[in-house]
Amino acid sequence: GEPREWECRRWHLVPSCAAGWVPQAPSTRNDIRDCSTDPPYLPPTATNTTARLAALRDTMRAHDVHAYIVPSTDAHMSEYISKRDARLGWLTGFTGSAGTSVVTQDKAALWTDSRYWTQAERELDCNWELQRTTWIESIAMWIMEAVPVGGNISLDPFLFSVATWNSYSQALYGSGRTLLPLETNLVDQVWGDQRPSPSSSKIYSLPAAFTGSSWQEKVAGIRQQMEQHVRRPTAVLLSGLEETAWLFNLRGDDIPYNPVFYSYTLLTNTSIRCLFVEGVTAGAGSAGSLSSGCPGPLCVELREYGQVSAHLRNYTLGDVTVWLGTEYTTYGLYGIIPQEKLLEESYSPVMTAKAVKNAQEQELLRAAHVRDAVAVIQYLLWLEKTVPQGQVDEFSGAQHIDALRRAQQHSHGPSFQSISASGLNAALAHYSPSNGSSRTLSAGEMYLFDTGGQYLDGTTDITRTVHWGPPCTEAYTRVLMGNIDLSRLVFPSNTAGRTVESLARRALWDVGLNYGHGTGHGIGNFLSVHEWPVGFQSNNVPLAAGMFTSIEPGYYRDGEFGIRIEDIALVVEAQTKKPFLTFEVVSLVPYDRNLIDLSLLSSEQIQYLNSYYKKIRERVGPELQRQQLQEEYEWLQESTEPFPVGSAVTTTATTAMLALTSLLSVLLSGLQA
């Protein structure tokens, strides 16, 4: 936990924010539930789930199920899902993108991470316990307390990855409870005809100018990896939606904000490759690009989405070996393949190949970020004019930046629901406003916006935090220091992201602060905004040149404010004698000068900022002029004025950074993945 009392005293030392800061007692809040009162207090944002739970429990009894586990994902382990797959949201009322619920005959609980704790308190009714962790061991312990020995614990095996199933199985092993896969989804049964219909979007081919290579070249590369593998697999099973989309240079609109379509692919080493698409006719528009190799080893055979299990079962009757990624292939599909015919790795060769962008893909993503910066700069200038007049609320702000992005060339809309959060709402890391409940932006409060765009040439994601009044600068500056320290790091090849991510936290740690979410994630070329397996978590692959990742430290004080600074960076070769790597930041929007306390920065950090601002001027300035945005161009020149490097800078910060760098170089030699 945070040293809250000490921390509050520390913030009172900052004159610019001491006068306006008033601690808020939990009892005065009306935006979250209070289950201790009689009757319980529920905010308007909470959902009454009593009838849904009663119906689910009836269905559980009919199937002899004592505990039922419901995840937040779909059959492809997608983070963003269609309304039809939002089972957790329908059952609980919780709309966050990550969570797990368990229902027994007399209890119900939701597990989610710190990004969503306050959101859950706003959306859950008092039928639900909120468990502030995501550990499967914690879920299993709760289940063992709630379910007697001999009880059946069930889940839908087509909604849990192999890795997650194994974790549950291990956590419950020897407990006397049975983990029972149940292919009939009990939530779907209760949801009934109220469940949204399947998507019917068209699949289309990505124009050649926006692909790094042809799909035939990509297939040849994957087959080469199959031949070179010691196990010589005969097929690769692709179940991540972005895998099939990337491999065949196809896109669709089955999931909001994500240009993907429901599909599986079984890529074999011979003439048959099956693309299982929801409603085969939906793929007719792109059939020409796929059938060009028929007959022969590059002939794509289209099959119905619902046939994947039967086809996989039939294929594995032969003398075959199927390669799959256990992190995101479902236990339901995995269970069809005989154990001796499996090649299990965390990620498929398609997933790892997609993560490393070639030179063409890198240029496409850079270009997308230049135009995206134009839209964000337009938004910042608009905010400066309109917020002091009280004309903007969170929802209208989100709508405005979405519209600015849509006006840019090659735009396909936002890459996720825009996070537009002022004051205490910014303490919710993934808060999104609605038309019905939206705070007015104020010059006296922090405003955090985390937004992104989908363009034919790339996907973007950027967060800026701004303030138009007398600000609290220390928290913002320490978050910025973390962003800078990780962005300018030089590190050995093959370094695991988890070994360096603490640099983004160090300036916060120095004063006993932290943040609860991850430091970064991969990003796609007109694909997913959160692209596996790149990032700084323990199950991410080692960093390699050509990978793109976000760098996004933050700091949040519940009920008061939130700060996050996010940029997208490309892993590139460093200018060193031996093969080392570093980051090239491709997000090109200046930070809020009003919030930067230069006295906390080292001279190296200020020099980095000045170099970054020079790059922004060089790359975004001409694009603003090309689009005849003269006022925005002048705003950019003013906002990227170089910072003074001199006596105001503390030498301690420099010395400490040098000491940390030398320590890190020693640590990294033993921590490479």
Report residues per predicted region.
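C-terminal GPI-anchoring signal of eukaryotic secretory precursors
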Residues: P644-A659
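Active-site neighborhoods and metal-handling regions in enzymes and metal-associated proteins
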Residues: W6, C17-S647, L668-Q672
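Cleavable N-terminal signal peptides of Sec/SRP-targeted secreted and luminal proteins
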Residues: G1, R9-G20, A656-L668
